[in-house]
Amino acid sequence: MGGGNGGFGYEIPPEALTDERFANMIREAEKYLGYPYVWGGASPSTSFDCSGFVSWVINNCGNGWNVGRQTADGLRSCCAYVPPEQAKPGDLIFFQGTYDTPGASHVGIYVGNQVMIHCGDPIQYANISTPYWQQHFMAFGRLP
C-alpha cells in the first residue's frame, strides 16, 4: 500500500500514510507514475494533463469526493486556503504563470517534505523548493 516510488525517486514517509485520506490519494496517484503528459487528458486511457490527473485522483481515490473534471483554477476554487506552514500531505498545491492563463495554471498533490506528485512529463515526483516552482508558487489548498 502506498509508499512505493515506482522507481521515480521519492519514498512517502510511513508516518504520512497514517492519514487515511492521504494514503488513499497516494495509492491512486502512484498508479500513474510515468504516464506521459497529454494536454486535455483526464483518464488512464488518454493519459493526463496536470488538472486531469489531480481531478482523476480526487474522484477515484475512495474518499467520497467528486469534483468532476476541473481546471487547475477550478480545483483551487474547490479548496480552502492553507498557509504554507500548515500544508500537509494530501493538500493540493497551485502555481501561476507556468503558461499564459489567468489564475492557477498548474496543480499537484503535496506529499510533504517539499515534494509534490504532479503531471509534468511524465507524471512524477518533483521538489517544490527549486527556483522554478518557487517563482510560480501560488497557494496550498485543502479539500473539505
Tell where the protein language model's regions lie, with residue ranges.
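Alpha-helix initiation/capping motif
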Residues: 14-18, 43-47, 130
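Intrinsically disordered, low-complexity
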Residues: 1-36, 85, 135-144
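Aromatic- and glycine-rich peptidoglycan recognition patches
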Residues: 5, 72, 76-84, 99-144
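Catalytic cysteine-centered active-site loop
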Residues: 35-89
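Extracytoplasmic/secreted proteins, especially bacterial periplasmic and envelope-associated proteins
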Residues: 20-24, 28, 49-52, 56, ...
